[in-house]
Amino acid sequence: MDKDNLAEIEARKKNWEESTLQKSLARYRLQQSPTRFYTPLDTRDHDFLEKVGFPGEYPYTAGTYPSTVYPLMRLRARGIADDMRVRRAGSYSGYGTAEDSRDFYRAMQGRGWTGGPNIAFDLPTQCGYDSDEPMAVGEVGRVGVAVDTLRDFEVLYEAFTGDRDLDKTASNFTINAPANIYLAMYFVLAEKRGISIDKLAGTPQNDILKEIVARGTYIFPIKPSMRMTRDSIVFCAEHTPQLNPVSISGYHMREAGASAAQSLAFTMANAIAYFQLGVDAGLDVDKFAGQMTFLTLGGSMDFYTEIAVRRAERRVFARIMKERFGAKNPRSWIQRQPGVLFLASTTTAQRPLNNLTRAVVGGMASAMAGYAPSVSPPYDEPLGLGWSLEAQQLSEDAMRVLICEAGMTDVLDPFAGSYFMESLTDKVEAEAWDIIKKIDELGGAVPAIESGFYHREIARSAYEFQRGVETGEKVIVGVNAFLGENELEVETSRLVAHPYDPKKRDEAEQRQLDNLAKVKKERDNAAVKASLERLKEAAKDESVNLIPPLMECVRLYASEGEMVNALKEVFGEYEGYGSL
């Protein structure tokens, strides 16, 4: 737009503010407007082709791909086409012992959830403890499945054979610090089934930096932890081209309290650190970039910001890969992630059915940002019942309504060119680049984390948010507002029994202890001990990739705790960041 037009708009805007707007404010006795109106003045220097472009083309602001298949769900509803989505068996889940989870997956397969598993592990497993260690007491099988040895993987994967075997379905492992141990188990299990590991597909989370910053299931100090991540990246690039070694995660930092811009910046800074590991190990960035995935940044109820931050993150990532790493393959410029996942911490135990409304808002933001309109988590998440079949059905149906009835996925990047959205996207991007610059000045993600920079920034942001809730400045319906005696407290109920019997969960710990004791009694313990010694020797040599020696230990049924303890003797343990 030329300068004369901008000058005219500026003059007309001033006249509007002084006359039309002021009359409206006076009527309602307001000093300033609670709303904003955007014009070309807010995007004076905006270059559409440079900043937005077209879907599936650099800088990917308008979308990762030139088209999506989500609208085809309408054809599936009419029986014209198969469902393009394959639902993971049980979604994200894991219960009790391997037998319990196997049976649960089979039950869910009977309901049409035929994809591979997205395995939730219990806390002892995530933190490197065997089920028979003192630190594991009371936690075995509680928030996920207990997996101590290859024997547990063998049992769990009895639910995935035939046309669902390891080379025909993908597995996700929500595991971080000990991720290489579980990759080793997956590889050895494939070997035992006669399946070449280059046919395996799946994704371990394996993002140790965000664990140290936000979640806490760390084991080793940062530098040896990054060495383990390097080993994952290199091994997968060389041997398992269909398997993604890392899912770089912003979600958990957002849950910990990071703002949208902080979450974007910290995630990208962590991504830079991980990509640099591969490059420093001698890999061509275009060889492994396509195997690196992202777990969404997480979404708040700030609808417009959540759309803007997704547009900005695609642009930021594309710039990092093209300009910083010199990637030549356009596939390397694409940020691979599932979409906008509504933050579980935004759900409330009070009036839980309101959470479905909140999740629908998140689904709409996801659709308008160019992804599937995932209506998640289920409304009963804060009640500890996020697995209820009623809640899952409502979430699934809400997504179907958004796609099939509302047509939310019919248009790619519907806000493209909007004065408001483009200015907001630019603002979020600029804030993120400022933080990334600060992290670079500190030496990169690892030194910045070691200095406490991430922790302090997230703590400050979390405090500001919580203070807003407690003062009432941040309104949360049914929690700090609209609580009068005339408000109806709507209760929820479960009508369908869950396939996993809670009684089994209560008995899981003893059964798992019995399973582990049996394995340790029947295996060749002398061979296990020797393999653990070889693992320690390998760990002392920085140049050695530890996945092959871990596979050797796994074949002999060494336990996770034994392998972790052997590595602790060489690496030590992470003590955690101190005061803020």
Describe the function of each predicted region.
Residues 1-151, 158-165, 190-193, 434-441, ...:
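Acidic/polar, glycine-rich intrinsically disordered N-terminal extensions of enzymes
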Residues 2-58, 183, 223, 261-285, ...:
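Gly/Pro-rich turn-and-neighbor structural signature
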Residues 109-115, 160-169, 189-200, 234-244, ...:
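Secondary-structure transition/capping motifs at alpha-helix termini
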Residues 110, 114, 119, 123, ...:
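Active-site cavity-forming subdomains of large catalytic enzyme subunits
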Residues 138-141, 210-220, 253-257, 296-305, ...:
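Short beta-alpha connecting loops at secondary-structure transitions
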Residues 148, 177, 192, 216-236, ...:
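Phosphate/diphosphate-binding loops
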Residues 207-209, 225-283, 357-436:
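Mobile "lid/hinge" segments at catalytic clefts and subdomain interfaces of large enzymes
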Residues 257-265, 300-312, 341-356, 385-395, ...:
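Short glycine/threonine-rich loop-to-helix capping motif typified by GTGT followed
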